[in-house]
């Protein structure tokens, strides 16, 4: 798996996959999870090159998922894609180990800009 996309909205997971392809990353293997609990299970199957996660999800928030990921992997790039993106949330995310944060709605160019330094 190259990218793990974690969002409780199936529509948003599809939008993210499409944005990744439109940004020129058609050959990447994108795996999906509905929440942090399911995402942790997916991580047992292998380490992605990048994790994209929503912030607000049932069962386990994106922030809690990030903290659990960072307990075992401090290097995998982790980006939040969320509709709530206050300065306080950005500080909390970055201080917890996030690599970047994107606001919804986003454009394919926003995705490309975030992915270029990570996947090249």
What residue spans do the PLM features occupy?
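Active-site residues of response regulator receiver
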Residues: 54, 82
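Receiver (REC) domain active-site loop signature in two-component systems and cognate sites
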Residues: 57
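Alpha4 helix (beta4-alpha4-beta5 surface) of REC/receiver domains from two-component response regulators
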Residues: 64, 85-100
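Helix N-cap/capping motif at the beta->alpha junctions
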Residues: 32-41, 62
């Amino acid at each position: 798996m190259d990218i793990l996309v974690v969002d409780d909205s199936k529509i948003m997971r599809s939008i993210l996959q499409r944005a990744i392809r439109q940004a020129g990353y058609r050959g990447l293997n994108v795996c999906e999870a509905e929440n942090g609990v399911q995402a942790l299970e997916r991580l047992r199957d292998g380490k992605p090159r990048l994790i994209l996660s929503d912030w607000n999800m049932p069962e386990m928030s994106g922030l809690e998922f990030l903290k659990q990921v960072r307990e075992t992997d401090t290097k995998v790039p982790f980006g939040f894609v969320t509709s709530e993106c206050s300065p306080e949330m950005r500080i909390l995310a970055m201080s917890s180990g996030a690599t970047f944060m994107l606001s919804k709605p986003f454009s394919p160019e926003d995705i490309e800009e975030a992915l270029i330094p990570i996947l090249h």
